Amino acid sequence: MQTLADLLNTIPAIDPAAMSRAQRHIDGLLKPVGSLGRLEALAIQLAGMPGLNGIPHVGKKAVLVMCADHGVWEEGVAISPKEVTAIQAENMTRGTTGVCVLAAQAGANVHVIDVGIDTAEPIPGLINMRVARGSGNIASAPAMSRRQAEKLLLDVICYTRELAKNGVTLFGVGELGMANTTPAAAIVSTITGRDPEEVVGIGANLPTDKLVNKIDVVRRAIMLNQPNPQDGVDVLAKVGGFDLVGMAGVMLGAASCGLPVLLDGFLSYAAALAACQMSPAIKPYLIPSHLSAEKGARIALSHLGLEPYLNMEMRLGEGSGAALAMPIIEAACAIYNNMGELAASNIVLPGNTTSDLNS
C-alpha cells in the first residue's frame, strides 16, 4: 500500500516539449496567431499534461462532490440548519441539485461522497468515505487529527486514480457542507497571510450583522490552533474540514495521473492552496472554472496565480462552476484537433508558422 508521501512523489512534471509542439501546431491553424486568446493557452496547457499524451482531448468526465458537516456551525456562522447537508446530499443522489443538472448538461458523472456528514446512518446512494460525524469545532479544537486528514487524503487520491484508470480524463471538484465557508476562510487567511476580515464573506446569505462574529470565529480558530502555513496537511487538519481535505485529495490524485482538475469556487480555492503546499507540482494541472462571488476569492486566486475563465457571479458551490466550465475544456480540445491548417490552404499570415507535430 502506497503512503501519502509516496503518492505525492509520483506527480509528474508538465512536458515543455509537448507544449512547444502544441504552440507551433496552434500557430499554424486557420486563424491569426493568438486570435482565439485563452482558448489557445488552455489547449497548450492540456497538451503538456502527461496523462493526455501530448494531444488535448476529453474522455470521461467526473465531478467529485465531497459532503461533510462542520462543528464550527455551532458558533452561529451559518443560517442554514445543519441538517441541510444530509438533505441536499440525498437530493444529489436524485440528480436534482444545481451541480447535477449542470453536470448532466456537460455529459459528466457526479460522484457524491460522504466524508463526514452528521447522520446516524450512512445515506443510501452516497459513496461512503466518512471519517466522522462532522469535524471538530475549529473555534475550540482542531478540525481533525493529522492521521485522519492523511488517511482521507490517501483514500480520495486512490479513488481518483481508480477513476482515471477507468477512462476519466477530466475531473471537477465540488463540496457540500453547512458553515464550510468558515474553515475555507481560515485556510485562505492562514496560507496567504491576509487578515480574516479581508477574506471572510457572507457564504450562503449570512446576514451582514452576523459577519463580525464569523470574522471573530475565524480569527479565534487560527489563534487557538496555530496551523503551520507551510504544511498543507497541518492547515487542513487544524482549521479545515473533511470536505476540504477530500477536494485536495481529488486534485492530488488527478495530478498524480497527469490529468486536469477543474476548480469550482471559494472552497476549492482554499483546498487548492493547501494541496499546493503539499505538492507545488500540482499547480499546472489546476484549471480555475469561475470567479466565486465570495469575498476572499480574488485573494486566494491571486496567491495561486490563477485567472478564472468565467465570471457568472456564482457562489452555489457543489462543483457547479466546474461542471459549467467543462465545455470550455472540450472547446479547447476541438480547436486543436479539428481546425484546418494555413499551409493546406496556401494562406500566409504574419506571425503564423506551418504546423509540424513531428518537429
UniProtKB/Swiss-Prot annotation:
One GO BP annotation of this record: cobalamin biosynthetic process
Pathway membership, UniProt: Nucleoside biosynthesis; alpha-ribazole biosynthesis; alpha-ribazole from 5,6-dimethylbenzimidazole: step 1/2
Reaction catalyzed: 5,6-dimethylbenzimidazole + nicotinate beta-D-ribonucleotide = alpha-ribazole 5'-phosphate + nicotinate + H(+)
InterPro entries assigned to the protein according to its UniProt record, in alphabetical order: Nict_dMeBzImd_PRibTrfase, Nict_dMeBzImd_PRibTrfase_bact, Nict_dMeBzImd_PRibTrfase_N, Nict_dMeBzImd_PRibTrfase_sf
An example molecular function term from Gene Ontology annotations: nicotinate-nucleotide-dimethylbenzimidazole phosphoribosyltransferase activity
Keyword set, alphabetical order: Cobalamin biosynthesis, Glycosyltransferase, Transferase
Active site: E318
Secretion signal span: none
Uppermost EC category: transferase
E.C. number(s) listed in UniProt: 2.4.2.21
Function description: Catalyzes the synthesis of alpha-ribazole-5'-phosphate from nicotinate mononucleotide (NAMN) and 5,6-dimethylbenzimidazole (DMB).
Subunit: Homodimer.
Protein family (similarity comment): Belongs to the CobT family.
Protein name: Nicotinate-nucleotide--dimethylbenzimidazole phosphoribosyltransferase
The organism of origin for this protein: Escherichia coli O17:K52:H18 (strain UMN026 / ExPEC)
